[in-house]
Amino acid sequence: MWRGLAGVFPLPTDSCNVEAGPRVSQHPRLAPRQQSPPDAIARSFAHSGSAFLCASFASGARYRYYEWSGIEQGLSVKYDTFRREYTAGGLTREGLDACPIRQVEIWLEQAVRADLIDPTGMVLATVDEGGEPRQRIVLLKGLSDAGFVFYTNHDSDKAHAIECEPRVSLLFPWNVLERQIIVGGTAEKMSDAESADYFMTRPRESQIAAWASRQSRPIADRAMLEQQAEDIRLQFGDGDIPTPAFWGGYRVVPQRIEFWQGGAHRLHDRFVYRKCAQGTWNIEQLQP
């Protein structure tokens, strides 16, 4: 059996092929839970078809693929039995910075040092004109006292939702570190100049993708998308690719930022910063 962070997953040894690398074994184990979060590297468990991607919880490990021929047979999973204790450490009022943005930066730095996969990935929640909530992951591309920055197609579903209801929520779900950050605020469209400055830093293929994709619109198949990208390559040749008029950034101006740290026996630590009329921040501790 392979014991993960959230439960137990069967890993048949007779159908498991392991790529060569340091600390390779048929039964990879987690490092001791007493490791401090910044030093304990994330253990990932993802699958694509019959391939499972595992990363060692110890520093310096390489990613390895496990082929599991029995995955097609399906699993009998008892979801109500998935549980674990949170032991990474507590969070105190004295340990928090007076500025929530600075505290976000501290936790982001620790998430990066822990080699988490996509530490800047954040769940963006919106509500459309019909009141339907939607969530998706976007990447944090800027952080300052002014707010949290991400970029997208202005004709996407998320952009239309923001136009109707600019109040949004962001979530940084760092499960391995037993941490969450929840941000509530208002999304504002950034200037064309700011968006262009960032667009110029993107890899060329990412620039092409921004032009090629009519984000959130139906498409016949993958081949059609690839052809649209090829058409853009031919259109611009070897020249510079300008910023599309339909693409740009949003800045989420925070009014509320909550920090959550998992605690033993589900007695978690929660602190919320709320912005006052004077521009200062008030800090409160919340019950879990």
Predicted regions and their residues:
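Intrinsic-disorder-associated, low-complexity terminal segments enriched in Asp/Asn/His/Tyr and depleted
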Residues: 14, 27, 39, 47, ...
